[in-house]
Amino acid sequence: MSTDIAIKVDADHLRRDAFLYVRQSSLRQVFENTESTKRQYALRDRAVALGWPIERVHVIDSDLGLSGAQSQDRDGFQHLVSEVAMGHAGIVLGLEVSRLARNNADWHRLLELAALSRTLIMDEDGVYDPAYFNDRMLLGLKGTMSEAELHILKSRLQGGILNKARRGELEMPLPIGLVYTPDARVVLDPDRQIQDTVRLLFDTFRQTGSACAVVRRLRGEKILFPRRIRRGIGKGDVLWNEIDHSRVLQILHNPRYAGAFAYGRTRTAYNAKLKPVQLRVARSDWQVLIPDAHDGYISWAEYERNQAALEQNATGFSPGLRGRMPRQGSGLLQGRLLCGRCGARMRVHYEPFEGRLRPYYVCNEAVVRHAGKHCQWVRGAPVDEAVSALLLEVMAPAAIDVALAVQQEITQRVEQAAALRGTQLQRARYEAELARRRYLKVDPDNRLVADALEADWNARLRDLDALQREHERQNEADHSLLDEPAQQRIRALTADFPRIWNDERTGAVERKRMLGLLIEDVTLLVDDEVNINIRWRGGRTQSLSVARPRPMSVIRKTPAQVVALINELLEATNDRQIAARLNELGHRNWRGEPFTPKKVMLVRRTYGLKSRYERLREGGMLTGEEVAQQLGVCESTVHQLGRKGTLKRHRYASNHRYLYEPPGNVRLEKGAGSRYGGRQPRLIVAQPLQQGAS
């Protein structure tokens, strides 16, 4: 039987050491349930009574405060298992099975190793030998009951939590800006600065529609955002620092700011290292969602609009995502294009061209998902120009409303930022004054405390001075946004909106934002023409067509009339003269540049036109060398005769190169044209040779 201790403990067991495993599930149990801990340590006396010397009874208590649901992170249990596996343990002591493990996998692995190494296991009920089937079956049953006990406890706790959550009464950690009252009601934080800062975040997102834009604006205006310390030193205190993108997304996704109670937004899972991680759960799978459960900063309808906007801002390849948030890049219709063939979202692709990026609208859904081919693509500039022209036509009646909206938005933004900076400055003054009073109350002889308080006072004064300078600088910058010249520029929208739209200082992001106020989406169908179907806000549609952009090979092609004119001019002029004549007539190449001799030469070679030289040679013209051989003189003499007009010549290149007309049956009169005077050289008809008598 399992209680027959004398039979089970033998000399081989006593030769090895005894290991006492002590564990409590939480630190709270360690401090409050001290009697249970004492009972576990008292098992050392049981081991001594069985014959183990006290110095060979090892206590493993490094797992105090850790749950027994798994062996991960329980260094003490892992050390115990390794000692059993190596045969160093003669007996393992634990108050009950639940102290060793509440997980069947860990428990049965320990039993298997104990059976192989002939290690005994002892609890408060008796001694067991896992090598015996009956003892092993009993230990296995105890392990199963221990795991079931944990499951039952968890189920009861979870059921109570869920039942309370369904009533909306479960107290959960609240985000910054919300607090609990003494009667467990959720209200807005009474700190006015915290309230105004949270409201500013939602107002900024309402204006910009982008989490990144919220971060840029708050950081640009030096607005600090609060964060409450959840645990550790300073728990409950509020820290103020610059906001980041992840923090903005957390706030925008949190339904508590819309006055809703939500439970089950995340679930716990384990990664490859068996570390618990929190995973987001889709809203349709939340266990509890109670709208209008308490006061909030925004309405539930606005919360849902924010979620839809954030989803549309995503730039991934998931179906339905369009990435509508205006980003850098000249593609005006970014995030609003739909393919007229397959209905998928069209994306903007940029290619370098002449030192800048040229946009193309591409439907690459088949390429991404099925390694197929592009559905359709088109150069973006003609489409953007057509949509811009239509937008300017539609915007003319609404220009006054736009100007008033812009002016109101700027004024509201400046006033909100100034008010928040004022509260930050007021808080900094209070903290500096509080540090001063602390310093003045300290005993001057207690230099350790006095020096620390003096350093804290100086730090508060430096922070106050930096905030004061930043506040003054921002006020000057805000004044430039509201002065009379700025007001005139805003009012100019009513009379000259097209000029402002086309102004180089109006960035691509601003144009896209204005376009998004009027246009819902644009569908493109590239055929013989580019068919553009525009769906306006409100559901009205409008269609237009633009000529399909020509291929680059066609764009670069020299017009046929220019090629014919060059061919005609080559009969009497060279490349330089032809270039000058083309420029006089107003002709330009495909880039709009004037013609040069080199460009004329490229056209001539591309189209196989004979050069001026080839045409003169075909007409019988001779080179200077050929004329010199015919006249029996040197080539320099021929050039001299050409310059003086004695020989007729024709220029065929720009570097003073000529071809000569055949001189015919003539010869150069000897003695004429000497270097030092004499008659001018002249050509005379050569007399035929007299035939002698045979």
Curated annotation (Swiss-Prot):
The keyword Membrane applies. The chain crosses the membrane at residues 386-406. Residues 175-316 bind DNA. Disulfide bonds: none annotated. The active site is at S25. It is a single-pass membrane protein. Keywords: DNA recombination, DNA-binding, Membrane, Plasmid, Transmembrane, Transmembrane helix. It is found in: Membrane. It comes from the Bacteria. The keyword Transmembrane helix applies. PANTHER family: DNA RECOMBINASE-RELATED, DNA-INVERTASE FROM LAMBDOID PROPHAGE. This is Uncharacterized protein y4bA/y4pH.
